[in-house]
């Protein structure tokens, strides 16, 4: 049951696309943080851009609850959270042509070759993301894994629905990014723009 003002959103039907007018109290540009983790990035973006709507997805219950508390403490009203696998949200729950920007920040690289089918960013996901994005919408990605970054670049080129460009906007760092930068790791980023 969804109550007014609640940050956590539970769809009435997980087999139909969301009706965004029921998710957010007001219309606005929609940005989606896939795998929002501890929620620091999501809440910081919601504070920076109060006129935009932010949807965070996370499969772990504890992370969803922690992020909800952060959003409530920050007083942001433009954040909603779904406790669902990110790939499922993109392929089944987001209506076509409604998303202005996706953020995929430090997804699990699944470094062993036999685990590559578990990687989030690959052909089917990219096709679904392109369908959910508005024309000119963006899929912004960061990782500390050079091999996965190369894999993503090849998958995006194979998809044919995106123009590849650099990520130029200075945005808040995630917990993982702060940790990896402190360890001296290289951070790879790109922004894919839907054609």
Go through the PLM ranges and name each one:
Residues 60:
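Conserved SAM/SAH-binding beta-strand->alpha-helix loop
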Residues 136-143:
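Conserved beta-strand signature within the Rossmann-like core of class I S-adenosyl-L-methionine
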Residues 1-32, 40-49, 69-96:
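S-adenosyl-L-methionine
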Residues 37:
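Conserved glycine-rich SAM-binding loop
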Residues 34, 57:
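Conserved beta-strand/loop positions that form the S-adenosyl-L-methionine
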Residues 121-135:
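A short glycine-rich, Lys/Arg-flanked "PGG" loop and its adjoining helix->strand segment in the class I
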Residues 148-195:
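Class I S-adenosyl-L-methionine
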């Amino acid at each position: 049951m969804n109550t007014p003002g609640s940050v956590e959103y539970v769809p009435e039907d997980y087999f139909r696309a969301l009706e965004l007018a029921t998710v957010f109290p007001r219309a606005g540009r929609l940005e989606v943080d896939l795998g929002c983790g501890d929620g620091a990035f999501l809440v910081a973006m919601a504070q920076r851009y109060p006129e935009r709507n932010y949807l965070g997805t996370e499969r772990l219950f504890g992370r969803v609850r922690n992020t909800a508390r952060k959003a409530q403490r920050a007083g942001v009203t433009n954040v909603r959270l779904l406790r669902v696998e990110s790939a499922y949200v993109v392929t089944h729950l987001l209506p076509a042509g409604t998303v202005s920007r996706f953020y995929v920040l430090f997804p699990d690289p699944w470094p062993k070759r036999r685990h590559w089918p578990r990687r989030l960013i690959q052909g089917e996901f990219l096709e679904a993301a392109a369908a959910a994005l508005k024309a000119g919408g963006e899929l912004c990605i960061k990782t500390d894994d050079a091999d996965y970054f190369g894999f993503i670049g090849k998958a995006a080129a194979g998809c044919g629905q995106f123009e590849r460009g650099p990520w130029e906007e200075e945005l808040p760092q995630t917990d993982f990014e702060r940790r990896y930068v402190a360890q001296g790791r290289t951070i790879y980023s790109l922004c894919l723009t839907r054609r």
